[in-house]
């Protein structure tokens, strides 16, 4: 219990709800709209989300001072362990309130276990940062159609138009193989089109996916040789791509 966050006062409160309650869906929908990589769940996706859970799974929702749901924790308790299936929050008050709820169980548990995403600074937020963390592969992503992907990708706005000529390497999808000109307008709209000229800059479709999905930054990928490009190009990509770690708690 020394590692659990100390109770901190928040303006809202946490209440247990049924796992099929509308508050859970409402909270998640708001969360997904500002969280990079989160699945937009329809009824089928929610059914899949609960498919393999036991009847012991419970849910608790944090309500703000306006009685609006701002976060939730899905959990179960077994063998003196508080298992967290999922915890989401739309602001810091909700995060604090949910951890207050978890900490309130300290007298009946020996430890807390759960899953979160890479780079979540969980240890930093605890009273004692000496915790065991294990990184496990969970999902694999792939850009199937690069030109179509770029059309819908939300680049950062800028005061200048930007462009990058490069060779994209994809041994599987012919539509992604070849030289491209990527243009990014001032309002952040991207467009990729094929060009018939050799390019010094090179990147594989795997690295492109890693970069655009936010798993690794352009500067790091260039440092380890996964992107061949001039320093000013890497700086442009750093500025154009949002710095958000992807999060997904669904499995299908």
Language-model region placement:
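Intrinsically disordered, low-complexity, positively biased terminal segments
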Residues: 4-252
């Amino acid at each position: 219990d020394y590692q659990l966050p100390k109770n901190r006062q928040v303006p809202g409160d946490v209440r247990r709800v049924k796992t099929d309650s509308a508050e859970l869906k409402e909270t998640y929908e708001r969360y997904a709209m500002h969280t990079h990589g989160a699945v937009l769940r329809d009824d089928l996706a929610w059914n899949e989300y609960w498919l393999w859970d036991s009847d012991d799974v419970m849910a608790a929702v944090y309500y703000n001072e306006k009685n609006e749901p701002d976060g939730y924790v899905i959990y179960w308790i077994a063998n003196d362990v508080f298992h967290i299936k999922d915890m989401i929050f739309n602001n810091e008050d909700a995060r604090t309130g949910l951890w207050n709820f978890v900490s309130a169980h300290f007298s009946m548990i020996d430890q807390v276990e759960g899953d979160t995403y890479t780079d979540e600074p969980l240890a930093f937020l605890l009273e004692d940062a000496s915790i065991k963390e294990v990184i496990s592969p969970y999902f694999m992503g792939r850009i199937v159609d690069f030109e179509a992907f770029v059309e819908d990708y939300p680049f950062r706005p800028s005061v200048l138009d930007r462009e990058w000529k490069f060779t994209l390497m994809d041994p599987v999808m012919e539509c992604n193989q070849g030289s491209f000109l990527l243009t990014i307008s001032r309002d952040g709209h991207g467009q990729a089109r094929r060009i018939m000229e050799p390019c010094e800059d090179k990147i594989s479709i795997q690295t492109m996916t890693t970069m655009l999905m936010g798993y690794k930054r352009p500067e790091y990928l260039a440092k380890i040789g996964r992107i061949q490009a001039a320093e000013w190009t890497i700086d442009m990509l750093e500025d154009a791509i949002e710095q958000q770690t992807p999060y997904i708690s669904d499995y299908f």
